[in-house]
Amino acid sequence: MYEKEVEQLQNIIDDSKRIVFFGGAGVSTESNIPDFRSADGLYQQKYKYSPEQIVSHSFFVRNPEGFYEFYKEKMMFLDAKPNAAHLKLAELEEAGKLTAVITQNIDGLHQAAGSKNVLELHG
């Protein structure tokens, strides 16, 4: 169905020397990690405080138990494994094609797949 597009992308990768990947939630949702903003994402769930408040420094100082409970329940996915996208990006880095991964994901799956130059930027 997308053979032509995949072939075009492969040609671009083959001809490139310094690729930077910009990614977000779509990469990790394939590893069963929920995103933040979809209809059933983290920001749509019901809590006494918003996720932004709960993960803030001031909330942590005032309520460390609540912070850790939320973090453990909603931010840690110990069973998640890198998927094909994570693995392919690590392979491209190892081959010297990929210079950096810039991601909004804070799940560590790019690093678990073997990528070394990962910038996690969320917020």
Task: State where each predicted segment sits.
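Conserved catalytic core of sirtuin-type NAD+-dependent deacylases
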Residues: M1-G123
